[in-house]
Curated annotation (Swiss-Prot):
Keywords: Calcium, Electron transport, Heme, Iron, Metal-binding, Oxidoreductase, Periplasm, Signal, Thioether bond, Transport
Thermal effects: Optimum temperature is 80 degrees Celsius.
Annotated positions binding heme 3: H58, C94, C97, H98
Lineage of the species this protein comes from: Bacteria, Pseudomonadati, Pseudomonadota, Gammaproteobacteria, Chromatiales
Cofactor binding note of this UniProt entry: Binds 1 Ca(2+) ion per monomer.
E.C. number: 1.7.2.2
Binding residue positions for heme 4: C255, C258, H259, H426
Protein name, as recorded: Cytochrome c-552
């Protein structure tokens, strides 16, 4: 630390006391005051934090605002951590100063369709259950709703915990503030005395695992080693009992997932993303080396017991395309199988926490590189991928992305308060709710009705292609039992299964991706037409083989 920073320490401490006064008023118990600590004492050990804190916008915020280190200071030494400080993970730690952002985050968008299945006749993917047969998502796959509910909705979804966790009552399903302040203020556990994964309700599954939860929360950030590897200092890992892990988690989408709490600078914390961008050298924009070079990510590794333990990724500049990609991305969050021999890939394998960081047309090769597939279809036996919300990769190369548009421009616009202050909305909602700040901000020649019309044009067209893809996939699936009964050879069936993989991939990407093609309409059209072609090819192959078998009798 240079002398200039040391001389500025008193000024930073005094300014930080102002925030501390506000913090004590908002969060302390009656009669309790937050007593600032000497940050220089903390920096004696936490040298990496010093580098970030002293030069960032949070330089005036004292350590005690987020940490209770009373016992830690008394028991720590240069060789031993001592009693670990208590670190605040709740979003209200930031709300003291960033009130407007917090209030917008907890605001529920009541215009959305809560818990609407994607697999209903009028929804996005009417034949989803048939096409995904054999996978846990067939038990429930709903449209997304407000981010405030992202953790609690994971706990209650029918495919995850067998119905163990439920809302305390139906009124709680609207309680965005409660869901943000603590999941267990709105949820109940059917059997708090047990931790085994089992079915409490019929027509449910127990498919959850610890990696799933890394998108929903980072409450466990200090207890999780890099990539979820087992480590003697880690309380949780990829192989932990997921029910016990779930009970230890409370808050959705912690502020520090995107904002470094010490510097206030932009960052990411999802280890799978850091691994893809930095460790594997794919960069922030794999299809645009120039942009990837401009938007760099620096991996910062923290040690525990003098061993590398966890890591964060500091961004050169704020880029919501990268920050949102911590969750809005296709990645492995489950066990699976090897393409080469069908052997099981367990949660102890790093492939169970893997970001492919590839678009729909590069995914197959990326999966082959790590020798992985997710599940076998219950009817055809084909080895298939199971795709998760690949918004980031879909956006790459689109007209909007090439013109410098980022996620926040459309989903988190700048909003002016009554006092004239401008802040970034953290409501993360559809541009339909704020066309003036989103679409019309660039398309000034349009009216709001024209912009909505263009959106509907793209999404309606894409949805039509999704439905056609499903029709031909279903037709192909229905032919497999017929072909088997007719005595069609395994060689022909395997050829059809390979076509099934392609048809499934190029279809399901667009049921998992949440824009119904709007993020990249040209890519959606090409992909879905490819799916239809592959299904038709398989249908023709199977029909010809069936006819040949019948004729030979």
């Amino acid at each position: 630390m240079n002398d200039l920073n040391r001389l500025g320490r008193v000024g930073r401490w005094i300014a930080g006391a102002a925030c501390l006064f506000l913090a004590s008023a908002a969060h302390a118990e009656p009669g309790e005051n937050l007593k600032p600590v000497d940050a220089m004492q903390c920096f004696d050990c936490h040298t990496q934090i010093e580098d970030m804190h002293t030069v960032g916008k949070h330089a005036t915020v004292n350590c005690v605002h987020c940490h209770d280190a009373t016992e830690h200071v008394e028991t720590a030494s240069s060789r031993r951590m001592g009693e670990r400080p208590v670190t605040r993970m709740d979003l209200e730690a930031c709300a003291t100063c960033h009130t407007a952002q917090f209030n917008s985050f907890v605001e529920v968008r009541h215009e959305s369709h809560p818990r609407l299945e994607k697999a209903t006749p009028t929804s996005r993917s009417p034949m989803f259950d048939k096409l995904i047969a054999g996978h846990g998502f067939a038990f429930e796959h709903a449209e997304p709703r407000s981010h405030a509910f992202m953790l609690v909705d994971h706990f209650v979804v029918d495919r995850a915990y067998g119905g163990r966790f439920q809302f305390k009552n139906w009124q709680k399903v609207t309680d965005g503030m409660g869901a943000v302040r603590g999941a267990w203020t709105v949820l109940t556990d059917a059997d708090p005395e047990s931790s085994d994964q089992r079915r409490f309700l019929s027509q449910t599954a127990t498919a959850a695992n610890p990696v799933c939860l890394n998108c929903k929360t980072q409450d466990h950030i200090l207890d999780w080693a890099y990539m979820g590897d087992e480590h003697e200092a880690a309380k949780w890992s990829r192989t932990s009992e997921v029910v016990e892990f779930a009970r230890d988690l409370n808050h959705p989408l912690n502020c520090f997932m995107c904002h470094d709490p010490h510097s206030a600078g932009p960052r990411v914390v999802r280890d799978g993303l850091i691994n893809a961008v930095v460790d594997r050298g794919l960069g922030t924009y794999p299809h645009d080396p120039v942009k990837s070079e401009q938007q760099g990510m620096t991996k910062v590794t923290f040690q525990r017991g003098r061993e590398d333990f966890r890591a964060i990724g500091l961004l050169d500049t704020a880029d919501s395309n990268v920050m949102c990609a911590q969750c809005h991305v296709e990645y492995n969050c489950n066990p699976g199988y090897q393409l080469s021999d069908g052997s099981r890939v367990g949660m102890d394998d790093r492939r169970a926490n893997h970001f492919f960081w590839a678009n729909v047309f590069d995914y197959k090769e990326a999966a082959q590189e790590i020798d992985f597939f997710d599940f076998r279809h219950a009817t055809t036996g084909a080895a298939l991928p199971k795709l998760q919300h690949p918004e980031a990769e879909t956006f790459w190369g689109s007209v909007h992305e090439r013109n410098g548009v980022a996620c926040a421009d459309c989903h988190m616009p700048k909003v002016q308060l009554e006092n004239g202050k401008v802040y970034t909305s953290h409501s993360q909602r559809t541009p339909r709710d704020m066309m003036g700040q989103a679409c019309l901000n660039c398309h000034a020649e349009w009216t709001e009705d024209q912009a909505l019309y263009a959106i509907d044009y793209i999404k309606n067209y894409t949805h039509g292609k999704i439905v056609k893809s499903e029709y031909w996939l279903a037709k192909m699936i229905d032919l497999f039992p017929v072909a088997k009964r007719a005595g069609v050879s395994e060689d022909v069936l395997n050829q059809a299964r390979e076509l099934h993989y392609d048809a499934h991939l190029y279809w399901e990407w667009w049921t998992a991706e949440n824009s119904v093609g709007f993020h990249n309409p040209d890519q959606a059209r090409e992909s879905l037409m490819t799916s239809i072609s592959k299904s038709k090819e398989a249908v023709s192959l199977l029909n010809d083989a069936i006819d040949a078998q019948v004729a030979s009798r």
